[in-house]
């Protein structure tokens, strides 16, 4: 009867612990539908796309050779990427330890003594015992600890990939910022040169008395020239600061950056965002959030396993030249084996508290995972909308620049014919300058939208 009761208790414990062995599965209530909005339909999820812009290797997105060289250098030398790689190594150590927990632990404890009685001949005894202990993972504690360590390692790898994506995006952003500032500097310097010549012309016209040129007109010309000249130091300072920021990203002292020109840049313009489920496998932060949830799931299983018995097998073997009262040589082999079972009965509520904490942490991780998904979809929606808006602005701005240029040319011709004032010439010239600078800014914003979309879709692959 006693044997039957023990058998029944063991069977009950085994059946109730079966779910502890289950691997993590994504919860069914995690929402992946409607993560981001179609910029055409305005409200529905893009489900028809099969190609995914985020799957493109970064070299196919950023084709400027100088930018590619900078990105390669950043991925090799950046302090951030080196720290991320070290974190992966740190996470590999607990995983190795959790795997070795399945192997018996061995301990060697050599001992030796020298003794003498009544000034007699000294006798020497020694023993070389080797002790082994092995925990039988009957209720899944070691298995879940190993799975938790594996999930933590995958989470750290996702963090490393996320660092790569951010480095690529930040390097591209800073590089294109330099190209934008270079173009703005070029436009502003060209305008300043035109205004300088206009001022010299106005001064000569006043001296010659042509078209009744007044001192006020000359001063207006000088003021316009000085205003444009005053903006040049700010642009040059911005260029220097962006170069320094890019050098810092590369882990180098500040220096000038070799680069191309804005007009030569070609970025993708036809995007397939992919179905929302692809965000789960593409975005590193989504991967990391799900691995954090998996880690919390296994931690809950570990907390559950604390309620079940622990069975440990231990044994020892060794050699000794001591056998009771007699001192003998050569050494003899000694061996023993023990099996023990530890069943928690009363732990002052510690195990219950640990389980409650683990369950709460698992729920927190699930909420964080869902929030990360929503944030990913929001970033994709914003990047798509930003690109569409910037494309429309660039198209309209091109028309503005053409019209402003024509207006400036016509006004200058009318002034030369004496049918327009110099104030009108200045106004037209300033409008043209403003339109050109805005066009450059809008072009850069569109490039930023491409980078943001690529990053939001988890881009950054090597191949």
What role is predicted for each listed range?
Residues 5-13:
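Sec-dependent N-terminal signal peptides
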Residues 7, 19-23, 267, 437-463:
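Acidic, low-complexity, intrinsically disordered peripheral segments
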Residues 15-17:
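C-terminal motif of bacterial Sec signal peptides marking the signal peptidase cleavage site
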Residues 19-94, 182, 215, 264-294, ...:
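Bacterial Sec-pathway N-terminal export signals of envelope proteins
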Residues 49, 193, 210-214, 218, ...:
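Short, solvent-exposed, mixed-charge loop/turn linkers that connect secondary-structure elements
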Residues 82, 102-123, 133-164, 182, ...:
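Small/polar (Gly/Ser/Thr/Ala-rich) solvent-exposed segments
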Residues 84-98, 163, 167-187, 197, ...:
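Amphipathic alpha-helical coiled-coil segments
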Residues 126-132, 275, 335-339:
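Hydrophobic, lipid-facing positions within transmembrane beta-strands of outer-membrane proteins
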């Amino acid at each position: 009867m006693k044997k039957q009761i023990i058998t029944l208790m063991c069977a009950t414990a085994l059946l109730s612990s079966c779910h502890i062995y289950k691997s993590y599965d994504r919860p069914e209530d995690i929402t992946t539908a409607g993560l981001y909005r179609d910029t055409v339909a305005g409200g529905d999820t893009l489900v028809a796309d099969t190609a995914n812009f985020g799957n493109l290797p970064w070299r196919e997105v950023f084709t400027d050779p100088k930018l590619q060289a900078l990105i390669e250098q950043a991925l090799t030398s950046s302090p951030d990427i080196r720290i991320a790689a070290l974190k992966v190594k740190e996470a590999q150590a607990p995983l190795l330890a959790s795997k070795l927990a399945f192997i018996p632990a061995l301990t060697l404890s050599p001992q030796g003594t020298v003794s003498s009685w009544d000034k007699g001949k000294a006798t020497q005894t020694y023993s070389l015992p080797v002790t082994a202990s092995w925990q039988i993972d009957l209720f899944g504690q070691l298995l879940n600890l190993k799975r938790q360590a594996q999930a933590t390692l995958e989470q750290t790898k996702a963090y490393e990939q996320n660092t790569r994506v951010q480095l690529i995006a930040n390097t591209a952003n800073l590089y294109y910022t330099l190209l934008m500032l270079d173009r703005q500097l070029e436009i502003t310097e060209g305008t300043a040169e035109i205004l300088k010549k206009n001022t010299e012309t106005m001064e000569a016209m006043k001296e010659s008395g042509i078209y009744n040129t007044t001192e006020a007109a000359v001063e207006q010309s000088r003021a316009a020239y000085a205003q444009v000249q005053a903006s040049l130091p700010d642009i040059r300072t911005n260029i220097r600061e962006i170069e320094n920021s890019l050098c810092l990203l590369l882990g180098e002292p500040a220096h000038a950056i070799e680069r191309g020109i804005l007009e030569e840049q070609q970025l993708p313009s036809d995007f397939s965002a992919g179905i929302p489920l692809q965000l789960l496998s593409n975005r590193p932060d989504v991967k990391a959030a799900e691995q954090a949830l998996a880690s919390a799931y296994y931690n809950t299983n570990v907390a559950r396993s604390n309620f079940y018995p622990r069975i440990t097998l231990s044994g020892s073997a060794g050699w000794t030249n001591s056998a009771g009262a007699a001192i003998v040589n050569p050494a003899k082999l000694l061996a023993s084996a023990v099996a023990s079972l530890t069943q928690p009965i009363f732990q002052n509520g510690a195990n219950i508290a640990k389980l409650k904490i683990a369950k709460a942490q698992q729920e927190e991780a699930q909420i964080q995972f869902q929030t990360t998904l929503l944030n990913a979809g929001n970033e994709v929606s914003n990047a798509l909308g930003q690109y569409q808006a910037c494309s429309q602005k660039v198209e309209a701005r091109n028309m503005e620049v053409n019209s402003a240029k024509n207006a400036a040319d016509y006004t200058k011709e009318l002034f030369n014919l004496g049918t327009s004032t110099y104030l009108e010439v200045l106004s037209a010239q300033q409008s043209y300058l403003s339109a050109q600078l805005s066009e450059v800014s809008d072009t850069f914003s569109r490039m930023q939208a491409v980078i943001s979309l690529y990053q939001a879709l988890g881009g950054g692959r090597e191949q």
